[in-house]
Structures are given as structure tokens and as C-alpha cells.
């Protein structure tokens, strides 16, 4: 049985919502075990609450060592100046021991993201994230254009061939759209199908 981990960081809940729909897509594939976890918050709780961070998220916090237990990992992060959030970077910077052992070599790595604006760095966030995964020897999987949501021209929407994305709005008031959530589900299903093939 293939094991898929959806691992995310979410400040205000947008990436959390996307992660839940990626899990939904992955769980639609028979014979795949799907786990949802998040990386630790690095901002002190009182300070995080004061700036509106959603600190009470249901997903348990992951540990670095458990990454080796999965056949595929789908990472989710908000964008920080065109890169992954510092919380995700801090977590991944602790994976040197896994790198030394080659523990993630040959496993699938995939990424989804959230940005504040339509051109806020969603693609650079995902492609720069890929660098870390490639150093670990992971096999990168995105979202193919077989996913019809990628060519939706009827609305302002996230979604890239590199991975699912959502646009949160500059003030965070916009929630993931139906199209963005469809792309997220597609990504989860696509990764799970490939993980199942590789694990068999």
C-alpha cells in the first residue's frame, strides 16, 4: 500500500483548506493511505494570535524523521516574497540527516501554494521549493494540463502546471475558489496514482 503525506504550513487557513482537498483527492485512489500533517509554528503563540494566525489547526504536527516513512509527500506553503514560508524552510533545514542517508531518494515530491495576489509569486514559490526536493533526490510531480481547471479563463484563479495554488487577496479575505479546490483535488489524486504505481 502506497503512503502519501500532505504536509503544510498555513498562517490564515487558506493552505490548510487546500491541503484538505488534496487529501480528498488522494483518498479517492484505492489502496493508498493518506496522512495530513503540518509543520511547527515558529512564531510564539501569543504573538501569532495577535496578528490573526490560525493557531488551532486540527492536523497534528509532523516530525522530520517521519518523512522517510512515506512514498510521496505533497508540501503546501504560503508565499513569502516568492519563496516558501519561513516555517516550512525551518522544518526542511532540519532534514540534513535524511539527506545524508538518502532517505527520500526516489520518493515523489509535489508542492502547492497560496499567494496574496494574482501575480504574487505562486510559480516561483513552487519552482524554488523544487530545488530542495531535487537535492533530496525526489521525483517532482506537478499538475498536468489534463486538469481542465488550469485553462479556466472565465475567472481570476490560481492553478499552475507546477502545482495547485490559491489567491488569498492582499487582506486574506478571499477563500479558495471551486476551481482552485478542484485543481487541488486533482493534484492529490494524480500524486496518489503515481505513488501507487511506484510502490507496486
UniProtKB/Swiss-Prot annotation:
Recorded superkingdom: Bacteria
Keyword Cell membrane: no
Pfam family membership, one: FMN_red
Residue intervals of the Flavodoxin-like domain: 4-191
Keywords from the named record: Flavoprotein, FMN, NAD, NADP, Nucleotide-binding, Oxidoreductase
PANTHER family in the cross-refs: FLAVODOXIN-RELATED PROTEIN WRBA-RELATED, FLAVOPROTEIN-LIKE PROTEIN YCP4-RELATED
Name the record gives this protein: NAD(P)H dehydrogenase (quinone)
Species, as recorded: Burkholderia orbicola (strain MC0-3)
Amino acid at each position: 500500500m502506497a503512503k502519501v503525506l500532505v504536509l503544510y504550513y498555513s498562517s490564515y487557513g487558506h493552505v490548510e483548506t487546500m491541503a484538505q482537498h488534496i487529501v480528498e483527492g488522494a483518498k479517492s485512489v484505492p489502496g493508498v493511505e493518506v496522512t495530513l500533517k503540518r509543520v511547527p509554528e515558529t512564531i510564539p503563540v501569543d504573538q501569532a494570535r495577535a496578528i490573526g494566525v490560525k493557531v488551532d489547526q486540527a492536523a497534528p504536527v509532523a516530525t522530520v524523521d517521519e518523512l522517510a516513512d512515506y512514498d510521496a509527500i505533497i508540501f503546501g506553503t504560503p508565499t513569502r516574497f516568492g519563496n516558501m514560508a519561513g516555517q516550512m524552510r525551518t522544518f526542511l533545514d532540519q532534514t540534513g540527516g535524511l539527506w545524508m542517508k538518502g532517505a527520500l531518494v526516489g520518493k515523489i515530491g509535489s508542492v502547492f501554494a497560496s499567494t496574496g495576489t494574482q501575480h504574487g509569486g505562486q510559480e516561483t514559490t513552487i519552482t524554488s521549493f523544487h530545488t530542495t526536493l531535487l537535492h533530496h533526490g525526489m521525483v517532482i510531480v506537478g499538475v498536468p494540463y489534463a486538469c481542465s481547471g488550469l485553462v479556466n479563463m472565465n475567472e481570476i484563479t490560481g492553478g499552475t502546471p507546477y502545482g495547485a495554488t490559491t489567491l488569498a487577496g492582499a487582506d486574506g479575505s478571499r477563500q479558495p475558489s471551486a476551481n482552485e479546490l478542484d485543481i487541488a483535488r486533482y493534484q492529490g489524486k494524480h500524486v496518489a496514482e503515481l505513488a501507487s504505481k511506484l510502490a507496486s
